[in-house]
């Protein structure tokens, strides 16, 4: 097989992206899937995503929800969910992943979210919420908050590297 043919064949969707995860990670994805599958029917659909956003105090436009659903080749069961994440996370910078998650709450698309929204996100009762002590510990790390808004790109950098000083020189 030629080098070009090998390269081309490696880009095909194999469905084996999920094989890259260890059991602990798969369990974490199961928990996340369970949170997203609001009606507990084993399929994440438009209604589930709308309910998930609503539970976080957000209203997602239908176009955004439809775009998410279209990323899957069919109904989003756990296997499809895991495959989608496998495709997304292959070669993805964890910092970029965190930024993408926070960007969902950036209503103004300005790189910042309200501090109150950050606390709501971190203390959301779905998933693994932070308790008061964990939130206090987060503040000891001096998150980039100014005027009641969090620079979530800088915060993601702080989370992934622990280095706030590097931001000033970047």
Curated annotation (Swiss-Prot):
Basic residues bias spans: 1-13
Top-level lineage group: Eukaryota
Chain segments carrying region Disordered: 1-22
Keyword annotations: Calcium, Metal-binding, Motor protein, Muscle protein, Myosin, Repeat
GO cellular component, one term: myosin II complex
Misc. comment: This chain binds calcium.
Protein name (record): Myosin regulatory light chain 1
Gene responsible for this protein: mlc-1
């Amino acid at each position: 097989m030629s080098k070009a043919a090998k390269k081309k064949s490696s880009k095909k969707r194999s469905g084996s992206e999920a094989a890259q995860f260890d059991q602990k990670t798969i369990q974490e994805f199961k928990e996340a899937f369970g949170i997203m599958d609001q009606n507990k029917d084993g399929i994440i659909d438009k209604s589930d995503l709308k309910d998930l956003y609503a539970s976080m105090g957000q209203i997602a436009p239908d176009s955004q929800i439809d775009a998410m659903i279209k990323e899957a080749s069919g109904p989003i069961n756990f296997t499809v969910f895991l495959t989608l994440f496998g495709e997304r996370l292959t070669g993805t910078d964890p910092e970029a992943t965190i930024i993408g998650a926070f960007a969902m709450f950036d209503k103004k698309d300005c790189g910042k979210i309200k501090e109150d929204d950050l606390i709501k996100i971190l203390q959301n009762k779905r998933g693994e919420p932070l308790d008061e002590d964990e939130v206090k510990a987060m503040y000891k790390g001096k998150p980039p908050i100014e005027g009641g808004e969090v620079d979530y790109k800088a915060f993601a950098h702080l989370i992934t590297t622990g280095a706030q000083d590097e931001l000033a020189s970047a």
